[in-house]
Design a protein with these regions (language model features):
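N-terminal, intrinsically disordered, basic low-complexity segments enriched in Arg/Pro/Ser/Thr
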Residues: 17-21, 30, 76
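Conserved phosphate/anionic-ligand binding catalytic regions in large, soluble enzymes, centered on
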Residues: 45, 93-99, 180-190
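N-terminal, positively charged, Ser/Thr/Ala/Gly-biased leader segments
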Residues: 3-6, 23-52, 187-196
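C-terminal binding/interaction regions
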Residues: 146-189
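Feature captures the catalytic cores and cofactor-binding loops of soluble hydro-lyases/lyases
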Residues: 51-52, 56-155, 164
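Alpha-helical scaffold segments in soluble metabolic enzymes
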Residues: 49, 63, 67, 125, ...
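Short, low-complexity, charge-dense intrinsically disordered segments
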Residues: 9-19
Length: 196
């Protein structure tokens, strides 16, 4: 995770920010506590499955959300409630570089994704659009679909409220928490530039 954070830190230079205008409309995220029902998926969930290529031309997040996981789980958008959490296996978000992959998940109202590991480009894209992701092998191994979990980003804790278990996840550095809380890198950079 540290090398990913270090790599992200290079994007702290707002002159290198390039995002579509609609990304500025990404809502801010309350990073105090995330709580929701778990929907569980396997390993190597790639971006082509998260949002199939035939829908990548869609730029409106709410429209894009309608097709999230369409080929993997056709009922995904119908069963997800705002605040629900995806728990998946290792290498989540592998495959082609699609910023629309984490955007489509975020636009469904999903609060976060928890996985043992994320593909590096998905990891960066998720942070860039202000979507919280957490690494925890224990959570993946011990949380079941339907469990209710609570995530404390500051403490780096994932609590399974159904079973009473607590798992660790490395907390984000403060600047990454700020990017997520602002709704993404574009808004974060815009506000930093405006502040001088």
């Amino acid at each position: 995770m540290l090398d990913r954070i270090g790599y992200l830190h290079g994007l702290h230079d707002s002159s290198r920010v390039a995002q579509p205008e609609h990304m500025l409309d990404s809502p801010e995220v309350d990073m105090k506590t995330l709580r929701g029902k778990v929907w569980k998926y396997g390993s190597d969930i790639n971006t082509d499955v998260i949002i199939p290529g035939r829908y990548c031309h869609i730029t409106e997040p709410k429209e894009l959300a309608k097709y999230c996981m369409a080929d993997l789980d056709p009922e995904f958008v119908n069963k997800m409630a705002p605040g629900d959490i995806i728990v998946a296996g290792p290498n989540f978000g592998c495959g082609s570089s699609r910023e629309v992959a984490p955007l489509s998940i975020k636009a469904t109202g999903t609060a976060a994704v928890v996985a043992p590991s994320f593909a590096r480009i998905f990891y960066r894209n998720a942070i860039n659009i202000g979507f919280p992701i957490f690494e925890s092998s224990e959570a993946y191994e011990q949380v079941d679909e339907g469990d209710e979990v609570e995530i404390d980003p500051d403490a780096g804790e994932i609590r399974n409220l159904t079973k009473g278990d607590t798992f660790k996840s490395a907390p984000f550095p403060e600047f990454v928490q700020e990017i997520i809380a602002k709704g993404g890198l574009a808004r974060y950079a815009e506000e930093r530039l405006a502040a001088g």
